[in-house]
Amino acid sequence: MKPYLLPPLAALVLAQLSVASCDGGSTADPGPPPDAKLDQANRAGTQALSMDMPSLAVTQYKTALQRAYERDDAGAIADVSYNLALAQMKGGDAKAALATVRDARLDLERRRAPVPAELFLVQAAAAYRSGDLTTADSAAQEALGRVSKDGDTAPRAWFIRGLVAAQRGDATALAQAIAKLPPSKEADLQADRQELEGRAALLDNRATDALDLFQRAAANRQQALDYRGMARALALAADAASRAGRTAEAADLAMRAGRSALLQGDTATALPLLRQANELARQSGQSGIVDEVARLRKVAAK
């Protein structure tokens, strides 16, 4: 059950230098005054990211980060590095995100400035997407051990720890992570809990329960405008449906997951899902899905 992607970190509030600083400065030491060039580039990056333009966001955040280093501002370095890593993650470049976090951490540690929890969180997410479960788990634990200005940091760190536990087949650790995610009215946080509960159900061989949970998670990801997370949940639902012997439903879910991934530009994820959908559709005699998969493959080949 290979994960398609990481938790919806792009839904986290992007730090804006004019209103927040990851170093938690006090009123006695407010730090340097705002810098128009830095703030403008940072805001432009945030706007680009909100419009699903991660490449442009990366360019703008790199400009802002260069300015932050130019003025030797530890708080700005932490803030903008976090934003840049998020944009790199959304653009599918987890390795670049890890490098961004590494550079920021080294700079902050050399000057004995505190490393904010959010940097550890995005490191955990990038490591998980890269397949480094050990680093993902340890970075998530670091995030949990630090004070954060964002109340969502802790539940998202527990979500990553839960994903790691599920990958390892560790039902006990997965149950612990689920227990740390209380019910929430926020769609994305609801989806986090439902996804972990679905993974726990699969570990317990309760495929039908898992299918229901993953479908509910997909609906909540959609409500949160997290289409990458929605596609992942649909792919997990397809796996659960297949395990439950519901081949026709699995074919439809896999096709929808693959189509969404393809239209997001993630061909590497889309093609295996479309192949799975094609095989399941042929097994269940669904010519309509076979035809749709063929059409989507032509789109991918262009």
Q: What role is predicted for each listed range?
A:
Residues 30-32, 70-73, 109-113, 147-151, ...:
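Short coil/turn linkers that connect adjacent helices within long alpha-helical scaffolds
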Residues 63-67, 102-109, 141-146, 178-186, ...:
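Amphipathic alpha-helical segments of tetratricopeptide repeats
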Residues 13-14, 18-79, 83:
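N-terminal leader/linker segments that initiate helical-solenoid repeat arrays
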Residues 39, 79, 118, 156-159, ...:
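Residue register of alpha-helical TPR repeats
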Residues 43, 76, 83, 122, ...:
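"A position-specific structural signal for the A-helix of alpha-solenoid helical repeats
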